[in-house]
From Swiss-Prot:
Protein name per its UniProtKB record: Large ribosomal subunit protein bL36
Keywords, in A-Z order: Ribonucleoprotein, Ribosomal protein
Record carries keyword ATP-binding: no
Membrane-spanning segments: none
Organismal lineage: Bacteria, Pseudomonadati, Spirochaetota, Spirochaetia, Spirochaetales
GO cellular component, one term: cytoplasm
PANTHER family the record matches: 50S RIBOSOMAL PROTEIN L36, CHLOROPLASTIC (PTHR42888), LARGE RIBOSOMAL SUBUNIT PROTEIN BL36C (PTHR42888:SF1)
Annotated InterPro entries: Ribosomal_bL36, Ribosomal_bL36_sp
Listed GO biological process terms: translation
Length: 37
């Protein structure tokens, strides 16, 4: 899980999800997991 100010999808399988006001990226590749913070 990477915590970044600007989250961007890295590959085609990355999905942007908003949960409780937190922007997250979920992917099949665990390295691509990100959240805004």
């Amino acid at each position: 899980m990477k915590v970044r100010t600007s989250v961007k999808p890295i590959c085609d399988k990355c999905k942007v999800i908003k949960r409780n006001g937190i922007v997250r990226i979920i992917c099949t590749n665990p390295k691509h997991k990100q959240r805004q913070g």
